[in-house]
């Protein structure tokens, strides 16, 4: 659930509205339909939350953990981001560039994955995403 107005949950995120604007509709097996945001917009909401409410706490941020899980778990995430609108693509490129330049992130990254062998995969995906940074 995304709250577009701060009054609803006491917080909001600059990426919620664009995420919903670009969301797709999914009909559930029992009939109701829901709106589903794309992985790139989900990543943008998570990075914004990490930077805002998460106060860039590299060790304890669930938002950063979610961000890393999506980068690790979606094989096509680099292509999904490349095919996204420029605003979200640029935001994620800057975010990836910033993470790779941050020693605190590189230090905690192995703690976000079950297998240390996945760390280079995540770093490589972030480097490709960061390659689009302006």
Where are these regions (language model features)?
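Compositionally biased terminal segments of proteins
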Residues: 1-134
């Amino acid at each position: 659930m995304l709250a577009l107005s701060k009054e609803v949950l006491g917080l909001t995120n600059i990426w919620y509205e664009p995420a919903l604007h670009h969301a797709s509709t999914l009909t559930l097996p029992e009939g109701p339909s829901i709106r589903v945001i794309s992985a790139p917009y989900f990543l943008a909401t998570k990075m914004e939350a990490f930077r805002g409410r998460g106060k860039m706490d590299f060790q304890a941020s669930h938002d950063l953990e979610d961000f890393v899980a999506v980068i690790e778990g979606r094989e096509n995430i680099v292509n999904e981001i490349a095919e996204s609108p420029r605003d979200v693509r640029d935001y994620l490129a800057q975010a990836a560039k910033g993470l790779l330049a941050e020693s605190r992130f590189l230090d905690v990254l192995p703690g976000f994955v079950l297998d240390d062998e996945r760390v280079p995969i995540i770093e490589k995906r972030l480097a490709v995403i960061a390659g689009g940074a302006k």
